Curated annotation (Swiss-Prot):
It is an enzyme of class 1 (oxidoreductase). NADPH binds at T10, G11, S12, I13, G36, R37, N38, N121, E123, G202. 1-deoxy-D-xylulose 5-phosphate binds at K122, S148, E149, S173, H196, S209, N214, K215, E218. This is 1-deoxy-D-xylulose 5-phosphate reductoisomerase. Pathway: Isoprenoid biosynthesis; isopentenyl diphosphate biosynthesis via DXP pathway; isopentenyl diphosphate from 1-deoxy-D-xylulose 5-phosphate: step 1/6. HAMAP family: DXP_reductoisom. Residues 370-380 have a biased composition (Basic and acidic residues). Mn(2+) binds at D147, E149, E218. Belongs to the DXR family. Keywords: Isoprene biosynthesis, Manganese, Metal-binding, NADP, Oxidoreductase. The gene is dxr.
Length: 390
């Protein structure tokens, strides 16, 4: 029986992780849950899984949960609450799925407590990947990726010598706007950009998929997770989302992981590792699929992913600043305060204006991300009030 804590339990990944737990009651016991403000969903989870401790983002939500939670469940709040769940002494595995930079402190706490981590929070690696991997190595902690692409790379590396890797190849669906002409992108609405063809995800990551910023952030994540320089990490657009990513070896051989588009696959791989668990999911029928297509990404239409390579080139706090700027720009787009194409423009402006410093602590990484967010908000506001060109 593996005792697990799930951070971000009411989000998309957290809900699917609990679905996996529910399928294997003899394998998993939930000891802790951390959520945002969705008290009704968290209460449903508490009643079903009976965790010992839960946390929500603020005290108001905590009071609402305490009023209805069954006896025996401790209810905490804020960052300190999420950290307590992540480092709970009874947890033998922590799934880190709190979205955005908000998940960094709890992810770091799990590592410091010596817990194996299933990492679904890519921003932790983007903000402080070098630091976290160093701490994980010092603590002897395994970090198992939950992003489908990084899970695919992890699976494609099993049994191989890391020194024989030539490059990593991350696949991208291309998002809902893959075939949209460049001239139309500036007028794309949030509703259109949120219609992902293959995956069901939260709003922020879906917009990042549409801009290809998500793939850029995954390049940063892969750079630290697998210790491969960005010059040896490539992106290829693969609309079917069947090949989840690939590893090319020095002899020219490519090993890939294929599967249907269902996050319960990589979630169960991380949670059950080193064993695989039988999932009642539809099989991948390659005969019916008929073909797999691949194409290079188009930096002219979707320049956002190139900013991630630039951030890695700059080093230090640059990736954290880029991540924060993207969070603010995407929020502005969803609120109709900036256009789709302005997301990348704002992020590029913030990144190039930033004075880079080495990342020496989690708090410094978070401060850099917050700086990027503030600078992006300023630029969105300035653009909104700029006179129209004649």
């Amino acid at each position: 029986m593996k005792r697990v804590a799930i951070l971000g339990s009411t989000g998309s990944i957290g809900v699917q992780a609990l679905d996996v737990v529910g399928r294997f009651p003899d394998r998993f016991e939930v000891v802790g849950l951390a959520a945002g403000r969705n008290a009704p969903r968290l209460l449903e989870q508490i009643r079903r899984f009976r965790p010992r401790v839960v946390s929500v983002c603020d005290e108001a939500a905590a009071r609402a949960v305490r009023a209805e939670a069954p006896p025996g469940t401790e209810v905490l709040s804020g960052d300190a609450g999420a950290v307590a769940v992540a480092s709970h002494p009874d947890a033998a595995f922590v799934l880190a799925a709190i979205s955005g930079g908000a998940g960094l402190r709890s992810t770091a706490a799990a590592i410091e407590a010596g817990k194996p981590v299933g990492l679904a929070n890519k921003e932790s690696m983007v903000l402080a990947g070098e630091l976290l991997m160093a701490r994980a190595a010092a603590k002897g902690v395994a970090i198992l990726p939950v992003d489908s692409e990084h899970s695919a790379i992890h699976q494609s590396l099993v049994g191989h010598n890391r020194g024989e890797v030539r490059r990593l190849i991350l696949t991208a669906s291309g998002g809902p706007l893959r075939c949209t002409p460049e001239a139309e992108l500036a007028t794309v609405t949030p509703e259109r950009a949120l219609k992902h063809p293959n995956w069901s995800m939260g709003d922020k990551i879906t917009i990042d998929s549409a801009t290809l910023m998500n793939k850029g952030l995954e390049v940063i994540e892969a750079r630290w997770l697998f210790g491969v320089e960005q010059q040896r990490i490539d992106i290829v657009v693969h609309p079917e989302s069947v090949v989840h990513s690939m590893v090319e070896y020095v002899d020219g051989s490519i090993v890939a992981q294929l599967g249907i588009s269902d996050m319960r696959g990589p979630i169960s791989y991380a949670m059950g590792h080193p064993e695989r668990m039988p999932l009642d999911l539809p099989p991948l029928d390659l005969g019916r699929l008929g073909k797999l297509t691949f194409e290079p990404p188009d930096p002219a239409r979707f320049p956002a992913y190139t900013l991630a390579y630039r951030a890695l080139e700059l080093g230090g706090t640059a990736p954290a600043v880029l991540s924060g700027a993207d969070e603010a720009a995407v929020a502005a787009f969803l609120a109709r305060r900036c256009s789709f194409t302005e997301i990348a423009e704002v992020c590029a402006d913030v990144l190039e204006a930033h004075v880079v410093e080495p990342v020496r602590s989690v708090e410094q990484a978070l401060a850099a991300s917050e700086h990027g967010r503030r600078e992006a908000e300023k630029r969105v506001g300035a653009r909104a009030h700029a006179p129209a060109s004649r």
